[in-house]
């Protein structure tokens, strides 16, 4: 409940109680200097104090109920200017060095409050130095009481290594939201996506949002590149979404080290692969990218050669090519 609501509530209680008390002789007894203001008469029922007390009890009960329902409201917890700590409640291994981490929100009806396509800042103390990195939760505001991060822990990493070492019950410092992307139905007629490794996370957030909304007709083509097949994150979910929404969502996998019998792309993503799998350049399409810097640099060059607009250093929502 915001401060102004609290002030109004307290003022209403005091005014109501004062008015009720003024209707009885007890106001004059409690506050003699207010006696000229009393408007009772001598014929007042001797049970009037009980009436006042019953009214007050009822009023207090109403306030308690009001506060209870206020506590049950779905409330976002993120604060863009203040670090807040959330406790690790689950850890699920996805690959050799990648896991899904589930963090508990203060209440079961809380939501993170993250616009689709935006991310959070995560803070860790490493060797006496504070390090901050950005991550995109794979959960959404449809998920109450928790949020999920998919993190690949690198041996030479900072925050990723810190998260990888966390144990159940440990606390993580978070603030946000931040970022220029804010997805909504109708943002583009057709979206192409290019991701490498954990660059999947902002793309997946948008994919889920678009496909679960029957009114959202956005076409999505997704190129997802990894080193090995075991590096492909959440593949079962991606394949299920592609099968269930085959008229709207298509995914193309690329591996540097493809196993025997692999039916997807092999090697680095080429200009020809982009031309084949992405929407053609137009005013009503977007290409979203997230991955390692060398990959993004290579993809940017390929896209420019194919006639797409050159992305800005810091992408904006209106850009045709957007880099997370």
Swiss-Prot record:
Chief location: mitochondrion
Return the InterPro entries for the record. Answer: CBR-like, Cbr1-like_FAD-bd_dom, FAD-bd_FR_type, Flavoprot_Pyr_Nucl_cyt_Rdtase, FNR_nucleotide-bd, OxRdtase_FAD/NAD-bd, Riboflavin_synthase-like_b-brl
* Protein known as: NADH-cytochrome b5 reductase 1
**Could you list the residue ranges that cross the membrane?**
49-69
Write out the catalysed reaction: 2 Fe(III)-[cytochrome b5] + NADH = 2 Fe(II)-[cytochrome b5] + NAD(+) + H(+); 2 Fe(3+)-[Dph3] + NADH = 2 Fe(2+)-[Dph3] + NAD(+) + H(+)
Protein localization = Mitochondrion outer membrane
One annotated GO molecular function = 2-(3-amino-3-carboxypropyl)histidine synthase activity
Q: What is any one of the record's Gene Ontology cellular component terms?
A: mitochondrial outer membrane
Q: Which cofactor does it need?
A: FAD
Q: In which pathway does it act?
A: Protein modification; peptidyl-diphthamide biosynthesis
Role summary: NADH-dependent reductase for DPH3 and cytochrome b5. Required for the first step of diphthamide biosynthesis, a post-translational modification of histidine which occurs in elongation factor 2. DPH1 and DPH2 transfer a 3-amino-3-carboxypropyl (ACP) group from S-adenosyl-L-methionine (SAM) to a histidine residue, the reaction is assisted by a reduction system comprising DPH3 and a NADH-dependent reductase, predominantly CBR1. By reducing DPH3, also involved in the formation of the tRNA wobble base modification mcm5s 2U (5-methoxycarbonylmethyl-2-thiouridine), mediated by the elongator complex.
Recorded hits in CDD domains, A to Z, give:
cyt_b5_reduct_like
Q: How does it sit in the membrane?
A: Single-pass membrane protein
- Where is the FAD-binding FR-type domain positioned along the sequence? 81-184
**Annotated GO biological process:** protein histidyl modification to diphthamide; tRNA wobble base 5-methoxycarbonylmethyl-2-thiouridinylation
Organism of provenance: Mycosarcoma maydis
Q: What is the lineage of its organism?
A: Eukaryota, Fungi, Dikarya, Basidiomycota, Ustilaginomycotina
Pfam families reported in the protein's UniProt record = FAD_binding_6, NAD_binding_1
What's the encoding gene here? CBR1
